[in-house]
């Protein structure tokens, strides 16, 4: 997003060194995976395979592989977390703000995979076959957020916004769901949206 245009790879003199931040991020990912396992989430898809991409939303394998249509939403999370931490924690080095973003994303992944939220998704959205993410999918979602955060750090604001809008429109038209609709339907399900989401892909 290049709002902090002077930001470049940091050294210890500029704040939190990249290697330390990387160690913290890897530790947080390990904690996320461990807690998810303790919550009863399966390590990989129960189908026994790990796919790089799974594009069938209405399937028991959705949110079980490395990437899917919802990966784009997690990239947008990274855009938003970069913008938010830049606004609120502007004096912090970008490496420290990345750790904050990973903490937020990890907390959401744990919340999303709680029994309450899983049932909320199943009752209020099109995710009737959703029984929680596999651990590999959840960790991959956090990595997608990290990629979005890093992209936002380097891209101009206009490019970042354009990419986010493009993702939302194209994904929304293809699977009739996206980050915006997901949040709306999680907070307050609307029958009109649910009925619209039941239709076939528009593109």
From Swiss-Prot:
Membrane-crossing ranges are 20-40, 69-89, 155-175
What is the membrane topology noted in the UniProt record heading this document?
A: Multi-pass membrane protein
Tell where it localizes.
Answer: Cell membrane
Pfam families the record matches: DUF2585
Which InterPro entries does its entry note? DUF2585
This protein's superkingdom?
Bacteria
Which keywords, in A-to-Z order, does the entry hold? Answer: Cell membrane, Membrane, Transmembrane, Transmembrane helix
A single Gene Ontology CC annotation of this entry is: plasma membrane
Answer whether the UniProt record assigns the keyword Transmembrane helix to this protein. yes
| Family membership noted in the UniProt record | Belongs to the UPF0314 family.
Q: What is this protein called?
A: UPF0314 protein RPA0307
